[in-house]
UniProtKB/Swiss-Prot annotation:
GO cellular component terms given for this protein: cytoplasm
Keywords assigned by UniProt, alphabetized: Chaperone, Cytoplasm, DNA replication, Metal-binding, Repeat, Stress response, Zinc, Zinc-finger
CR-type Zn finger ranges: 127-209
Annotated positions binding Zn(2+) 1: C140, C143, C197, C200
Subunit: Homodimer.
Name of the featured protein: Chaperone protein DnaJ
Function: Participates actively in the response to hyperosmotic and heat shock by preventing the aggregation of stress-denatured proteins and by disaggregating proteins, also in an autonomous, DnaK-independent fashion. Unfolded proteins bind initially to DnaJ; upon interaction with the DnaJ-bound protein, DnaK hydrolyzes its bound ATP, resulting in the formation of a stable complex. GrpE releases ADP from DnaK; ATP binding to DnaK triggers the release of the substrate protein, thus completing the reaction cycle.
Length: 371
């Protein structure tokens, strides 16, 4: 057996996270569960999935498996180097009972879920309330999560006698060692369901569409998360639901940009407004604000509108809006505008690379030699 077969059984990569391994296990175990899949070979596949998950869900066993393969995960090495004592630690731990084993019958919280919600630029600044709808594993409505057919109850597992674990003998360099593994009949619950629920087929869960209202505070930004306790997937053995993490994605604005509580706006003005000054209505998310542009304003000059930015999530208060001036140079001029600009250049003493063309009256004066 190569060192990737267990990963292949679950359909995950070798660098998969524990969360990815857990989700893959749940998906594959449902796919091949003998009570659901009646095809030939499904039961064998189911056992292979159980074996793979038993190893990969345990960090120490997984490390030994990655290094030595199945023999390493089970404590039976063919050899080791100076850094390969992790497997022997597992052996002694199993033999002497060190480290203990998590109670498989204990209630376990359900998996967490993520949901991405899009907000407009303004919604992120002022806050909003959104109703989100998503599919999740919920407690079965027929059996209330017990997995048993209504009117019946689970019985003590005959293989593990309710402990949820069984003893397995393993051949190691030190001889035969006995270790405890999760019971493959009850999957660690300690109970066996003789008559399974017709809705959930004994899992105790069913996929349902769930809706929840999310209050989004003012001032949120892209990437921030809101945690909703108990809105994730159903737990196990009577454990609580997991949590829902709502991930914020703020859509861009056509007018503004934002960094934290500061909003940025680019104001395009003419060179006449820049030279002579003007009073202009500036758009903000809070409404238009009148702002004075002083005479002689240069392009790139930034003005601050205090309190016209986004709320500060921490510390309270309101950010500012920065208004940066951009002087727009006209690309098309009529004759009157050109004459006026040439006159301005002459009055300013500017030397033109291309002097202005003579007008009709100038040409007449030249022809008559009149000053």
């Amino acid at each position: 057996m190569n060192n990737t077969e267990f990963y292949d059984r679950l359909g995950v990569s070798k660098d998969a996270s524990q969360d990815e391994i857990k989700k893959a296990y749940r998906r594959m175990s449902k796919k091949y569960h003998p009570d659901i899949n009646k095809e030939a070979g499904a039961e064998e596949k189911y056992k292979e999935v159980q074996e793979a998950y038993e190893t990969l869900s345990d960090t120490q066993k997984r490390a030994a498996y990655d290094q030595y393969g199945a023999a390493g995960a089970n404590g039976g090495f063919g050899g080791f180097d100076g850094g390969g004592f992790g497997g022997f630690e597992d052996i002694f731990s199993s033999f002497f009972g060190g480290g203990g084993m998590r109670n498989p019958n204990a209630p376990r919280q359900g998996d967490d879920l993520q949901y991405r919600v899009n907000l407009s630029f303004e919604e992120a600044i002022f806050g909003a309330e959104k109703e989100v709808s998503y599919n999740r594993e919920s407690s079965c409505h027929t059996c209330s999560g017990s997995g048993a057919k209504p009117g019946t109850s689970p019985v003590t597992c005959q293989k593990c006698h309710g402990s949820g674990v069984i003893n397995v003998d393993t051949q190691t360099p030190l001889g035969t060692m006995r270790r405890q593994v999760t019971c493959d009949v009850c999957q660690g619950s300690g109970q066996e369901i003789k008559e399974k629920c017709p809705t959930c087929h004994g899992t105790g869960h069913e996929k349902k569409t769930h809706k929840v209202s999310v209050k989004i505070p003012a001032g949120v930004e892209t990437g921030q998360q809101i945690r909703l306790t108990g809105q994730g997937e159903a737990g196990f053995n009577g454990g609580p639901y997991g949590d829902l993490f709502v991930i914020i994605n703020v859509l861009p604005s056509q007018q503004f940009e934002r960094n934290g509580s500061t909003i940025y706006y680019t104001l395009n003005i003419s060179f006449v407004q820049a030279a002579l000054g003007d009073t202009i209505d500036i758009p903000t998310v809070h409404g238009a604000v009148e702002m004075s542009i002083p005479a002689g304003t240069q392009t790139g000059k930034t003005f601050r509108l205090r309190g016209k930015g986004a709320p500060k999530l921490r510390g309270g208060g309101q950010g500012d809006q920065h208004v940066t001036v951009n002087i727009v140079t006209p690309t098309k001029l009529n004759d009157a505008q050109k004459e006026a600009l040439h006159a301005f250049a002459e009055a300013s003493g500017d030397k033109m690379v291309h002097p202005k063309k003579k007008g009709f009256f100038d040409k007449v004066k030249d022809a008559l030699d009149v000053d």
